[in-house]
């Protein structure tokens, strides 16, 4: 019998305590325990939630086999329960596609992104912020497939969505850095030098002018830092890392 007492919010709240400490070992144990509970209780929503979290955890830790097993398990569950057109399932398709992208399976990745995109376009308003995440992640796979024009189109569409939500402006910085990587992949670093420089300038301008230096901003700084370092701007890389550290420490 399905147990209706399981709270997704409480599960994620407890999980975040492990993740904030980078305690991935106990985060995994916690999630596997909830996976067993959800299967025993036939709580499909909780099972899908937990499998999504586990696939993300395994992706971050580079554990390909376990990540793929979670993807296959959650896709099978969605199929069994007839949830193919559900918006929540679209998010699962997106997460699964990201796993396949991370482990160099772009064809499998793009197929799932296309499924997610079709559901989002049918179910959500065109300026729903979830589109920004879809477009950004899908574009990364399109770059792997050397479908550069489509990738840049999605990056521009992601920016258009994010611009509707000023509090998420730092995500545009991430998009510009993704575009720098994309134009390098398309043309090579020498030919693309001027375009790369322009994308980096745009990203830096956003990061410097964003007013709310909170935990979200710190996360974006950390994510962007290595890209600036990759392109030789070691000073700004270190500045972003230090900025994030100060925010996390509350100074």
Q: Which residues does each PLM region occupy?
A:
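Conserved alpha-helical positions within TPR/SEL1-like repeat arrays
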Residues: 12-20, 48-60, 87-102, 129-144, ...
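Amphipathic alpha-helical segments of tetratricopeptide repeats
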Residues: 35-37, 73-80, 117-122, 159-164, ...
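Short coil/turn linking the two alpha-helices of tandem helical-hairpin repeats
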Residues: 82, 97, 124, 165-166, ...
């Amino acid at each position: 019998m399905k147990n209706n007492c399981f709270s997704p919010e409480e599960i994620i709240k407890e999980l975040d305590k492990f993740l904030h400490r980078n305690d991935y070992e106990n985060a995994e144990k916690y999630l596997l325990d909830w996976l067993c509970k959800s299967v025993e209780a036939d709580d499909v929503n909780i099972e899908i939630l937990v499998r999504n979290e586990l696939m993300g955890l395994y992706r971050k830790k580079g554990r390909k086999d376990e990540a793929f097993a979670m993807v296959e398990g959650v896709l099978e569950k969605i199929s069994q329960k007839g949830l193919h057109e559900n918006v929540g399932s679209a998010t699962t398709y997106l997460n699964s596609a990201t796993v396949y992208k991370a482990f160099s399976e772009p064809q499998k990745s793009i197929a799932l992104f296309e499924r997610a995109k079709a559901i989002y376009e049918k179910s959500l308003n065109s300026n729903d912020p979830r589109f920004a995440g879809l477009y950004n992640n899908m574009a990364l796979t399109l770059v792997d497939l050397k479908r550069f024009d489509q990738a840049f189109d999605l990056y521009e569409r992601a920016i258009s969505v994010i611009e509707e939500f000023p509090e998420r402006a730092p995500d545009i910085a991430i998009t510009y850095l993704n575009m720098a990587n994309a134009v390098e992949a398309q043309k090579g670093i020498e030919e693309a030098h001027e375009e790369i420089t322009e994308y980096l300038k745009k990203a830096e301008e956003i990061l410097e002018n964003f007013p709310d230096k909170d935990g979200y901003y710190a996360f974006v700084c950390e994510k962007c830092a290595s890209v600036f370092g990759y392109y030789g701007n070691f000073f700004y890389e270190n500045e972003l890392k230090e900025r994030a550290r100060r925010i996390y420490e509350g100074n």
